């Protein structure tokens, strides 16, 4: 079934890519007969597949099925919009892209937690959905499954609205500097070197929510298209290559005239040999040399775009596509790129202009000219100076002070100044190179094209499946025990009295603390790898991903301490397990911790006192849907459902019971295990 679903997805994905391109094409050049045929086919596929996808996603969702449902729905709407606005060419693009309509990418969804605690979640970009998923995962035990599913379905609908039909999300619908949960997991695998998590996440470039694509060469593709149609494109490259530096030309010509006086029959003098070597080794720089133009590289790129636009008239006259009618301003084209150039070309042009502006500064030009060894040595040779430095005559130390004059002092000062400026120049060039590389990477990450990633769909599907499985599990054929029976109350009191005088060993407390942490770790942070993380680390990842404040972690660590006694956790109420009475979310969360702590510690003490082996499971352990399952397909033990109506489900030997009181459940287990032991 998954293979068939993937095959349908690949075909629909390819069609949505073509349709997304059609939304920018001149409608006069679209074959509307083909569009009409494809619309009819999509309508048939929609009627056949959409109900099945809807049913599947309400039983057990997958990121593939949810995204396919979105693509089919959006594709049908876009094709219908094509047909509706085909006749109005003047308003075609405005209607297709809803340019005059108010922004529809804002959503406010209300989630109702226990005890009618309502929280409004506002969303406008893709990252908001990912952030919401992490936060709901950290408080999954504070909400009923039915209420969570109602809100999650609204979130998925909003995600489908943002998804559209194009594989490329709109640039204003995501931010690449907001880390997702996968970015967090990757950074957790690396040593933090003493830095906090927020500082590590400051310079993150998320590639999971929207995948970054490597830039591809675009320049030259349109020229090849023109050449195939025998249209010659004028190029200025040959002119640029023939331009050379005038100073280097003069030096080269003068050097060659000096060497013309030397013949093969003469002995080679040191100046002649050095002059010949310098001309030889500087030949590469001579070929690359070009006059510095006043036009920047960015201006050249923009003029290249305009030039290629003029050549479009040779292919199709009177063509008006979306970018002809809505042209970006020059400053906007830096961020959106061009039709005939890539973002990589834009980044290279900006780096080149920054470097050129730095090098044009007068002090750097002068110092770089002085540092050019070839230039200095050639000038000395052409001026007739001897290249071999003569050793200065030895002067007694006592006579040095007498021959020092003010001119030499000034000369030394200028020499020190030049040395200092050369050092500053060297450091400045190094800093310039580092800055260009760093900012170039930032520009590439910001401006490069990205496509939809799978992170958001994976996270929202995991959350939805968790609440689906919870709802399915409590809806199975369980036996509901009487809620307010006198016998149940006495049984509960018996177990409480039994364990109240006992105490857990301090060695046992540490393992129980990890079990408690595991039961409150969200479904997005559950470790199913071959090398799972410890429960405390997994919970820390869950809270860090949700952005929990430090004092929340402190409160968690204070839930269980080494000297804890039954009087500290045993509730005095009857039949009120997981009955939340708080009205704000923080208090609801803490109250849920108390109930889960009571379950872990009481069951452990019960096993220790009565030598039982009763296990505790949770709804987090379900890896597939629970539809049409029976009690005999579950392991024996206590299942924590996090639902206030059916918080505890006790499965024992092919039967299952729903309890609202933990100690009545333990007494029931004591009876069943005693009978089996007696037989």
Curated annotation (Swiss-Prot):
Subunit structure of this chain's protein: Associates with TRM2 and TRM3 to form the tripartite terminase complex. Interacts with portal protein.
Listed name of the protein: Tripartite terminase subunit 1
GO biological-process terms attached to the record: viral DNA genome packaging
Any matching Pfam family: PRTP
Function field: Component of the molecular motor that translocates viral genomic DNA in empty capsid during DNA packaging. Forms a tripartite terminase complex together with TRM2 and TRM3 in the host cytoplasm. Once the complex reaches the host nucleus, it interacts with the capsid portal vertex. This portal forms a ring in which genomic DNA is translocated into the capsid. TRM1 carries an endonuclease activity that plays an important role for the cleavage of concatemeric viral DNA into unit length genomes.
UniProtKB keywords: ATP-binding, Host nucleus, Late protein, Metal-binding, Nucleotide-binding, Viral genome packaging, Viral release from host cell, Zinc, Zinc-finger
GO CC terms, sorted: host cell nucleus
Lineage: Viruses, Duplodnaviria, Heunggongvirae, Peploviricota, Herviviricetes
Species annotation: Saimiriine herpesvirus 2 (strain 11) (SaHV-2)
Stated family: Belongs to the herpesviridae TRM1 protein family.
